[in-house]
UniProtKB/Swiss-Prot annotation:
Residues 126-203, 204-317, 318-374 form the Ig-like C2-type domain. Glycans are attached at N296, N325. Residues 419-458 are cytoplasmic. It comes from Pan troglodytes (Chimpanzee). It holds the Pfam family ig. This is T-cell surface glycoprotein CD4. Coiled coil: none annotated. It is a single-pass type I membrane protein.
């Protein structure tokens, strides 16, 4: 019995040694699910001779009878073919169309006294549920492979990111830059096959935007999409958080159907206007400090879980002059690195601070500029003209007092004049009345120099 053990070991070693020789010459071909593959078989004689293709179960797939193509009873019957034009050259190909994972097998070509074996491994790579995904969602790629295989997969995204894995690859938090063609390579037995998958990330072109406006100017908000779909249906809403308000509120709601926009509800203050076609476009009639703040536009697409988001910010500037103070202010979300300045035209800045309000006391006459800038780049500018003032601050008040006194004196003088004139007329009227009475009574008046001849009674 002890002598039998070494013999069995020797037999096993011989089998292992002979195994590579039995499989020597077997070619490995990788195919893609749904594609077409050509398995080659070349005869030593460059002429048309009889050949047969069989599977590992020795079931005939196809062959020839002279110049005619014959097919066997295999499950591939309606999906196989051969290039007859190459038979005369001793090339007898097996063409398998619309490959399936279950087509993975060892195919045997018998031509003349030759026998060739080709191992076909069919792989499939598919994306989870849909290739149209919302920004921020996860992408999962699943590899279908034949039993017994142990492939590795490496994918490269459009933005150049490499992902490696086995039969499942996952990418979380998709970004807009991930939209495009993904190239995935499957490796098996030192052979490789390449897949290309088109992924569309549904998103706005910009995650956020900021609009700078002077007080009173018209404001335009635009929300262009980063993708194109023939039939786009959904609904959206713009919520706004004003800087001066304690809570946010809905400014407008709308529906989207076949790229046409219809407004469902809009606030009266402010009363936004919305374009009727894509891209989504909103108009605010006037930029006012009470509207400065941040908004969030959401778009829910039909048959999609989740929403698209775009943040929009409004910064409003106001330049005012009140008595001796020239003020420049901004409202809305601004970066701490932004600089606010007040300067006289063509001169150096009088004041420049990283704050939301600056001012100048007793400003010189001329055109003043209120500037909001970032690293020297002017983002917003508002001009205000300061008129010349009096040399001393007392004179305007003195003129007002003097004017008031002069007006009062003139009023009193006119009153006295009219009063004296009225009194004089009344006295003159009394005298005339007295003269008439005396004349009617034939009495002399009290004026002897005029009526002395008629002073005595008749």
């Amino acid at each position: 019995m002890n002598r039998g053990v070494p013999f069995r070991h020797l037999l096993l070693v011989l089998q292992l040694a002979l195994l590579p020789a039995a499989t020597q010459g077997k070619k490995v071909v990788l195919g893609k699910k749904g594609d077409t593959v050509e398995l080659t078989c070349t005869a030593s004689q460059k002429k048309s001779i009889q050949f047969h293709w069989k599977n590992s179960n020795q079931t005939k797939i196809l062959g020839n009878q002279g110049s005619f193509l014959t097919k066997g009873p295999s499950k591939l019957n309606d999906r196989v073919d051969s290039r007859r034009s190459l038979w005369d050259q001793g090339n007898f190909t097996l063409i398998i169309k619309n490959l399936k994972i279950e087509d993975s097998d060892t195919y045997i070509c018998e031509v003349g006294d030759q026998k060739e074996e080709v191992q076909l491994l069919v792989f499939g790579l598919t994306a989870n549920s849909d290739t149209h995904l919302l920004q921020g969602q996860s992408l999962t790629l699943t590899l279908e492979s034949p039993p017994g295989s142990s492939p590795s997969v490496q994918c490269r995204s459009p933005r150049g990111k490499n992902i490696q894995g086995g039969k499942t690859l996952s990418v979380s938090q998709l970004e807009l830059q991930d939209s495009g063609t993904w190239t995935c390579t499957v490796l098996q037995n030192q052979k490789k096959v390449e897949f290309k998958i088109d992924i569309v990330v549904l998103a706005f072109q910009k995650a956020s935007s900021i609009v700078y406006k002077k007080e009173g100017e018209q404001v335009e908000f635009s929300f262009p999409l980063a993708f194109t779909v023939e039939k786009l249906t959904g609904s959206g809403e713009l919520w706004w958080q004003a800087e001066r308000a304690s809570s946010s509120k809905s400014w407008i709601t709308f529906d989207l159907k076949n790229k046409e926009v219809s407004v469902k509800r809009v606030t009266q203050d402010p009363k936004l206007q919305m374009g009727k076609k894509l891209p989504l476009h909103l108009t605010l009639p006037q930029a006012l400090p009470q509207y400065a703040g941040s908004g969030n536009l959401t778009l829910a697409l039909e048959a999609k879980t989740g929403k698209l988001h775009q943040e929009v910010n409004l910064v409003v500037m106001r330049a005012t002059q009140l008595q001796k103070n020239l003020t420049c202010e901004v409202w809305g979300p601004t970066s701490p690195k932004l600089m606010l300045s007040l300067k006289l035209e063509n001169k150096e800045a009088k004041v420049s601070k990283r704050e939301k309000a600056v001012w100048v006391l007793n400003p010189e006459a001329g055109m003043w500029q209120c500037l909001l800038s970032d690293s020297g780049q002017v983002l917003l500018e508002s001009n205000i003209k300061v008129l010349p003032t009096w040399s001393t601050p007392v004179q305007p008040m003195a003129l007002i007092v003097l004017g008031g006194v002069a007006g009062l004196l003139l009023f009193i003088g006119l009153g006295i004049f009219f009063c004296v004139r009225c009194r004089h007329r009344r006295r003159q009227a009394q005298r005339m009345s007295q003269i008439k009475r005396l004349l009617s009574e034939k009495k002399t008046c009290q004026c002897p120099h005029r009526f002395q001849k008629t002073c005595s009674p008749i």
